[in-house]
Amino acid sequence: MSEVLQRITDPKEIKDLDEKELEILAEDLREFLIESVSNTGGHFASNLGVIDLTVALFKNFDFSEDRIIWDVGHQSYAYKILTGRKDKFNTLRQYGGLCGFPKRTESEYDFFATGHSSTSLSSAAGMARAQRLLGKDNKVIAVIGDGALTGGMALEALNDIGYRKDNLIIILNDNQMSICKNVGGLATYLNKLRMGVGYNKLKSDIGSTLDTTSFGKRVKNSLSKLKDGIKKIVVPSMYFEDIGLKYFGIVDGHNIRELNEVLSIAKNIKGPVIIHTVTKKGKGYELAEKNPNKYHGVSPFDLGEGVISKFASRNYSSTFGEEMIKLAKNDDKVVAITAAMPDGTGLKEFREEFPDRFFDVGIAEQHAVTLAAGMAAEGLKPFFAVYSTFLQRAYDQVLHDVCIQKLPVTLCLDRAGLVGEDGETHQGIFDISFLSPMPNMTIVAPKCIDEMEVILKWASNFNAPLAIRYPRGGDIDVNLKPLSKIEYGKWEKVQEGDKIAIVATGKMVQHAMIAAQKIKEEKNIDILIINATFIKPIDKELLNSLSKDGFKIVTIEDNIKKGGFGEGVLEYLNEIGHKEKIVTLAFNDKFIEHGKPDILYKINGLDAEGIKNTLIELL
């Protein structure tokens, strides 16, 4: 590493660097990021792709005054390094360390927290309007990827920004990827724009030539009357300018000179500007350039060997994908939907085997849910695979388009519960609370991977709205047998016991088993453990029996306490006049920060030791 990055103590110092030094700084950042993220894990390829752009932004703007919002935020690592967080980068995504996304409480340079996609344009427009109303003239910049631009919220914002003529700069970071390959009409449009780069160069070259003589200037003035028509022919649609944005492109996102030129022009233009840059995910690390999807998010890895795929252990996502293929082979009405996450949700092989029955709608969860509702209305059996945290974006569609009509749409909620290192914006700890109040909604959870297969088979013949929630990763080493069949609304006694009954949901049954074993070893007392396969409806018959037999009851869930499973059980037990103690173990009313799940469970009293301590207090 050269001395350029080492000597930067204030981001304002970057303004004083010449072009050669800026290029060296970019290489220093690449070298530092490759070394650091290979040790900590994190978002890898996307960050390598925006380093040159980040350097150019610091050259042209003062972020002690100007504002920048990184859409999604996973590509903000170089920005974090240059804003005083380099020495803490070895704590990235660790509990108590740096967050992997922008976070207002982490730095004065993080102006708006992000994590979910397609929010940057709306927040940037809000900041720009606030600047105007407050009499300020600071620049506002939003950096958004071509994948995030497929999100409906981003398109809504573009429409409003073009109409209101907000004074902001939008940088379209076009790497032709979100996590996986982009899909949809906008992706096709952007590809046509890339192909039309010759038009932009031709226009520039001809203009420069004509400007050299007075006759040429008159010719240029006459030809300008044909400009709009020529654009329509050579560059398809000119969508951005049609809705009121000044378009600059296409710019090489790895050419600092080009970036400086266009940014220096854009910052002096009033009204909305969009700069279309083309970048390469993984730039500077050959293996990531060749396979950016594999290197999107990585665990720690050896730089010489690269990321090694893990095939040894089963996980819920891959099992879901395998079972979906089995269902589709036996039932031609089964279809799969995802919102730009075919790999993460385990549907990659399904897509290859059943391309006509697989629908990747892009980053469009609202559309995905109502698309599924339409399919269900016509007799298909749609399964929408989505991370729990992203289903939050489609609350109204689930309620209005699925539940009111009681349509048989199956919501497969991957990453339910703690996801760990991605932190507050990605923890899947709210789905029980926002789905439970919906009439006609049923919620189930497998206690182990093998039970996932049983539930999915049952779900394919369930004729009403259904949510299946399951965690990231695999099982703990606990010996659990799956249910042989599903009986609607009924729970399962996993282990017999006296005095205390644990009623746990999903993977928390495994935590309960370990805690109960500790109690057996220390106190020689057997704890009754119940697998609440159905989170909604609750098994009132079994609860009546527990109450009649005088059990103290502990509910355990990896969801927030408010509106959760435990509160539903507590409400019913109070209704029937249960006399014994009731304890609900869940996450309290707070957001759960980033860190390894084991640490986060422990801190929140939901690991086996914490559960054991709760049980001891009840004995």
Swiss-Prot record:
Its EC number is 2.2.1.7. One of its GO terms (biological process) is isopentenyl diphosphate biosynthetic process, methylerythritol 4-phosphate pathway. It holds the Pfam family Transket_pyr. It is an enzyme of class 2 (transferase). Its cofactor is Mg(2+); thiamine diphosphate. Disulfide bonds: none annotated. Pathway: Metabolic intermediate biosynthesis; 1-deoxy-D-xylulose 5-phosphate biosynthesis; 1-deoxy-D-xylulose 5-phosphate from D-glyceraldehyde 3-phosphate and pyruvate: step 1/1. GO terms for cellular component: cytosol. Keywords: Isoprene biosynthesis, Magnesium, Metal-binding, Thiamine biosynthesis, Thiamine pyrophosphate, Transferase. One of its GO terms (molecular function) is magnesium ion binding. Binds 1 Mg(2+) ion per subunit. It catalyses: D-glyceraldehyde 3-phosphate + pyruvate + H(+) = 1-deoxy-D-xylulose 5-phosphate + CO2. Mg(2+) binds at D146, N175. InterPro entries: Dxylulose-5-P_synthase, THDP-binding, Transketo_C/PFOR_II, Transketolase-like_Pyr-bd, Transketolase_BS, Transketolase_C, Transketolase_CS. Thiamine diphosphate binds at H74, G115, H116, S117, G147, A148, N175, Y285, E365. Catalyzes the acyloin condensation reaction between C atoms 2 and 3 of pyruvate and glyceraldehyde 3-phosphate to yield 1-deoxy-D-xylulose-5-phosphate (DXP). Belongs to the transketolase family. DXPS subfamily. Homodimer. This is 1-deoxy-D-xylulose-5-phosphate synthase. It comes from Clostridium perfringens (strain ATCC 13124 / DSM 756 / JCM 1290 / NCIMB 6125 / NCTC 8237 / Type A). The gene is dxs.
